[in-house]
Amino acid sequence: MSSAQTDNGPLLAVSGLGKRFGGFVALENIDLTIATGERVGLIGPNGSGKSTLVNCLCGTLRNETGAVLFDGRPVDGLIAHERTRLGLARSFQLPKPFHTLNLIDNLRVPLLYTVNARPGHHLSDEQVAARCAELLEAVALADKARRLPRDLTQVEMRKLELARAVATEPRLLFADEAMAGLSPSEVEEIIAVLLRLNQQGITIVLIEHIMRAVMSFSTRLLVLVAGQKIADGLPQEVMRNPEVERAYLGE
């Protein structure tokens, strides 16, 4: 397991995680830790198990073996929305906003059903409205607050997806392919948003195929190949790893 952690232990600790689909081994004996405040890139060729790993960690899928601890608490038995209420959130590769709701109301839903569902938390209507406005400002969508998702460009839709995830007030955010299909300048916009979120205290794991973006954002890389973790370390060191070179370039 990686040594990256805080004095109080890692924010996320995974040991021996495995997942099968019938006879197919999707993940095998995955060990990893994520420390509070980190910016981690999770990379690997198509079919390497990245999405399956994220789904297991976020509660969409159930791992057959191993253990997942979030802030020291076992979460293997919790489903996705229960993990989200603890502070473990994700954005999706294919954004699925509420198409009949404007942007403010798209953010109001996770605030009401995640943040307000936490013990001891209750945001007033005024606080919810203020937080929605703050989130839209953070992703440069304040001028679209009353618009519907269908009115957004592709990069704006990506920003809305991130804002919806951040509305749950996560401590750890998995950003899954947040830049897919974007132009180089739009990729830079999303990197800037993610960096701001990290500076505000959100630990982020970026799952991404655009290596320029991964290298620009990440302070650490994890590499999956064929359901196994083959590298974990500083970006420049990982990219010089012979196993990683073979995985991407072949023999």
Task: Enumerate the predicted regions with their spans.
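Helix-to-loop junction immediately C-terminal to a conserved catalytic motif
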Residues: C58
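Catalytic Walker B motif of ABC-type/P-loop ATPase nucleotide-binding domains
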Residues: L173-E177
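Conserved ABC transporter NBD signature motif
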Residues: G66-V75, L86, G120
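The feature captures the beta-strand-to-loop junction immediately N-terminal to the Walker
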Residues: I43-P45
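Conserved ABC nucleotide-binding domain
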Residues: D76-G77, L135-E156
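Conserved catalytic motifs of ABC-family nucleotide-binding domains
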Residues: E169
